[in-house]
Regions:
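N-terminal "arm"/small-domain region of PLP-dependent enzymes with the aminotransferase-like
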Residues: 1-38
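Conserved core of the PLP fold type I
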Residues: 31-171
Length: 172
């Protein structure tokens, strides 16, 4: 079970990949225990952008942000980009922690159907839900878990992304 950011065995004991443990134990104490700068290590942030986008960097403002893990990033996003009482949108296949984070922040988690009857990305369901929610609130935070969607493994295609962006641009 690696859904909480750590891998546990069947008895609930933490599993550490031997290669990772070897590298960690080889680090000098000052590298192992030191805090990184609050904004993150510049070389790391640049590497994140390069690995994420490679030759496909969008034209526009682009910045990597260091957070205390993926869950912390989602938590901060919910708090900072939605209002108390608002709905946050994600697909009906989602990591259960999204709901906990929304409830804790006084938001509601709403879902759309990820797949249509042909097991393709369901842009119609996405569009309908976006339109419905934006009829009742001023802005909408949308969590789209791609590539390698957890738990399905599905990744939006470029065509899917174009359709999603078209829906978002209609409300910009």
């Amino acid at each position: 079970n690696g859904t909480i950011g750590a891998i546990m065995d069947d008895e609930g004991k933490l599993i550490c990949i031997p290669t990772v443990e070897k590298v960690l134990r080889s680090l000098p104490t000052n590298e192992l225990a030191a805090y990184a700068p609050i904004i993150g290590l510049p070389a790391y942030l640049e590497a994140v952008k390069n690995l994420t986008f490679a030759d496909n960097k969008p034209d526009g403002y682009l910045e990597a942000v260091a957070t205390a893990g993926g869950t912390g990033a989602i938590h901060n996003t919910i708090w900072n980009y939605s209002e108390i009482g608002d709905s946050v949108l994600t697909s009906d296949w989602y990591w259960g922690t999204y709901n906990v984070l929304c409830q804790e922040a006084g938001r509601k988690l709403e879902t759309y159907e990820l797949f249509d009857e042909n097991m393709n990305y369901n842009i119609e369901s996405f569009t309908d839900k976006v339109n419905t929610l934006l009829a009742d609130q001023d802005s909408l935070l949308i969590i789209i878990n791609t590539p390698a969607h957890n738990p399905t493994g599905y990744s939006l295609s470029e065509e899917d992304w174009d359709k999603v962006l078209d829906v978002c641009k209609e409300h910009a």
